[in-house]
UniProtKB/Swiss-Prot annotation:
SMART domains on file: HATPase_c (SM00387), PBPb (SM00062)
UniProt keyword list: ATP-binding, Cell membrane, Kinase, Membrane, Nucleotide-binding, Phosphoprotein, Signal, Transferase, Transmembrane, Transmembrane helix
Record bears the keyword Transmembrane helix: yes
EC number(s) on file: 2.7.13.3
Gene3D superfamilies xrefs: 1.10.287.130, Histidine kinase-like ATPase, C-terminal domain (3.30.565.10), Periplasmic binding protein-like II (3.40.190.10)
Species in which this protein is naturally found: Shewanella frigidimarina (strain NCIMB 400)
Coiled coil: none
Gene Ontology CC terms, in alphabetical order: plasma membrane
Protein name (database record): Putative sensor protein Sfri_3689
């Protein structure tokens, strides 16, 4: 026996002479790391032992408190080289950190009967116990939350405070909490995972070479499958502890066997080492090639994804159950919106459209409307009973198409208006001339009629008393003359609407002068209303036709008066300059307009005052004049509150 022990000492002396790694442990939680009968064991310890074998380093285990270990690992002169801690996913500690060892998470724990915690918002205003330095603490350092934080040294301390009602919630790592729950039956799990993390080996940032060796060994264990065996051993179903005594016996027997085999195996070490070096080089070359291929595939995938994400069009792939398999998330919400209609206002049903495309295997294209926007929808069949849906905004094309159609209608209307104006002008002139003659003749015949009536008291004109008949004739002449003048005014509006104005005839026009002239010419209509003017000094000037601008403002003032016909109105006219633009504004507190009327007020012959003699050409002519002046007419109106019209022109440059 003494000889055997001596042989073991001789064999193990080279091992003792090798470099060592001081591995700090603190946990009492199976199956990670815990002490039984003075011996530390667990997944982390056995994994570190295996890493030590691969790196030819002796592993020395030292147990301290968690806070002391965290403090030591931040100290480059500490006696602790490596510890195993949990780090939040996508958040590294300010330490040298290994690849993930094992996934875990943190949840909220409360007393039995308390409300469940569905998300972070449910913690607002609560007292929450957080373990100092733990991965929950690291996560919260970059994700501030609105709750009262209570720092504790251990999760178990947090559970004790919870029982004493000194905290409302404990956020704890799942392995530790699972061990503590049987000891605290009044505590329960109250949430799904709030934070995801992973166990890692960490060391001081100055020990990057050591961490590189640990990572290389860890990856070798994963590639060889030995890591999976360790995971199955320590994390298998129902396996939280191992029989330490039997393990010690097996390890002792194994040590004896290894010692005997080591003596024999040293003879072949040289040959094996050479073979391993060749094999390692081959594996390294293959690993480098695989990593390069993975990087290329990842770059291509990211490039393809970025191209799809950068498309202005919405692209979505769905199956026949309408499950969204992939999408670049551009405007995809429209497909499920109740405001997404066909342009003819028919209701759109995504499922019906998808099923039709899948059944016919033919592409589907439709023009759609969403609020004030227009879209083109395309649905194309692809493999595996799936379709790709394309959404492209076509608002601008729709507006251009409408503008083109309106321009065509207006061109036809202009030609028609010019012909009508010419044909109506001549007979209208004859009517006006004849009515003027009749009016003058009635004045001359009135004395003669009175003289004849005295001689013949029973004389009648058209069955009426001569005085009444003459009065009716005079009224009829006035009505005919007024109607003829109205016809003439409409004809002039039609001619003006049909004939474009020549811009070369424009001169410098003061907007203040336009307001003052329009006020004088509408004084009779505005005398029953309160007119207020706020004119800019100096007056903003534009290039244009003064008479046409007078006509525009006169028409707008008359419309404002008509809108305030049921009560004395307040009409405000102002001129000002903004962003190098000259602006003329007229505002009233009249009846206002609904949205349907507002959309049509510049259409030719559209009027809401047909019974009062409106022709529907006033605002059409105004709109045309403003466009000829390269201006813009903005109209805002609220039913029952009033209307504001702003005329915006380019400010003229004055010498």
């Amino acid at each position: 026996m003494k000889t055997l022990l001596l042989l073991l000492i001789i064999i193990t002396m080279p091992v003792l002479a090798q470099d060592s790694i001081v591995f700090g442990v603190h946990s009492k939680t199976a199956p990670l790391e815990w002490r039984n009968n003075g011996v530390d064991q667990g997944f982390n310890i056995e994994l570190m032992d295996r890493i030590g074998q691969l790196t030819n380093k002796r592993i020395i285990v030292r147990r301290k408190s968690f806070q002391q270990l965290v403090k030591d690992v931040h100290d480059p002169d500490s006696d602790i080289d490596v510890i195993a801690v949990v780090s939040p996913v996508n958040m590294d500690r300010k330490l040298a950190q290994s690849d993930p060892i094992y996934a875990t998470h943190a949840k909220a724990y409360t007393l039995q009967g308390k409300a469940l915690i569905n998300n972070w918002a449910d913690l607002v205003g609560k007292r929450v116990a957080i373990k100092n330095g733990a991965f929950v603490d690291v996560f919260l350092s970059d994700h501030l939350q609105n709750f009262d934080r209570v720092d504790v040294d251990l999760y178990e301390t947090g559970f004790q405070l919870l029982i004493k009602n000194q905290v409302d919630v404990v956020i704890a790592e799942s392995f530790v909490a699972r061990r503590l729950l049987p000891l605290y039956p009044s505590v329960r799990s109250s949430s799904d995972a709030l934070i995801y993390g992973a166990f890692n080996f960490v060391a001081n940032e100055t020990k990057t070479e050591l961490m590189y060796q640990i990572n290389e060994a860890l990856r070798q264990l994963k590639l060889s499958g030995e890591y999976d065996k360790l995971v199955n051993k320590w994390f298998g179903t129902g396996r939280e502890k191992v029989d330490l005594t039997s393990s010690e016996k097996r390890m002792f027997a194994l040590a004896i066997l290894v010692a005997i085999m080591s003596a024999i195996g040293m003879i072949f070490t040289g040959f094996i080492s050479a073979s391993l070096r060749r094999h390692t080089k081959a594996l390294d070359a293959e690993l480098i090639q695989r990593k390069r291929i993975e990087v290329e595939i990842s770059e291509l995938s990211q490039q393809f994804q970025s191209v799809l994400d950068g498309l202005p069009n919405g692209v979505t792939i769905v199956n026949q159950e309408l499950q969204h398999l992939w999408s670049n998330d551009n405007n995809i919400h429209l497909l499920d919106s109740d405001e997404f209609y066909y342009v003819d206002n028919n209701v759109f049903k995504l499922k019906a459209a998808v099923l039709e495309v899948l059944s016919t295997q033919k592409s589907f294209t439709a023009d759609m409307r969403y609020q004030q926007q227009f879209w083109q929808l395309q649905i194309h069949p692809i493999a595996n009973n799936q379709v790709v849906i394309l959404l492209e905004e076509s608002t601008e094309q729709h507006r251009l198409r409408q503008a083109n159609e309106e321009a065509s209608r207006l061109a036809s209307l202009g030609e028609l208006s010019a012909g009508i104006a010419h044909e109506i002008n001549n007979p209208t002139g004859l009517i006006v001339h004849a009515v003027s003659l009749f009016t003058a003749a009635m004045k001359d015949l009135t004395p003669a009629a009175k003289h004849y009536q005295k001689q013949n008291p029973f004389w009648l004109i058209a069955g009426l008393n001569p005085d009444i008949a003459i009065e009716e004739l005079q009224y009829s002449c006035g009505s005919i003359e007024e109607g003829a003048k109205r016809i003439s005014r409409i004809v002039n509006d039609l001619k003006r609407y049909a004939m474009p104005h020549i811009a070369d005839q424009y001169t410098l026009v003061s907007l203040n002068d336009v307001v003052q002239v329009a006020q004088r010419l509408t004084a009779n209509q505005t005398k029953s209303h309160q007119i207020s003017t706020m004119l800019c000094d100096p007056s903003p000037c534009i290039t244009g036709d003064a008479q046409q601008l007078h006509q525009v403002l006169i028409n707008l003032i008359q419309n404002a008066c008509n809108a305030c016909s049921t009560q004395p109105g307040i009409i405000v006219i102002d001129t000002h300059v903004a962003n190098n633009m000259a602006i003329l504004s007229i505002k009233d507190n009249g009846c206002g307009m609904d949205s349907a009327t507002l959309k049509r007020i510049t259409e030719p012959f559209f009027t809401t005052r047909r019974n009062e003699g409106g022709s529907g050409l006033g605002l059409s002519v105004c709109s045309k004049i403003i466009k000829e002046h390269q201006g813009e007419m903005q109209i805002q109106s609220t039913l029952g509150k009033g209307t504001q019209i702003r005329l915006i022109f380019a400010l003229a440059q004055q010498d």
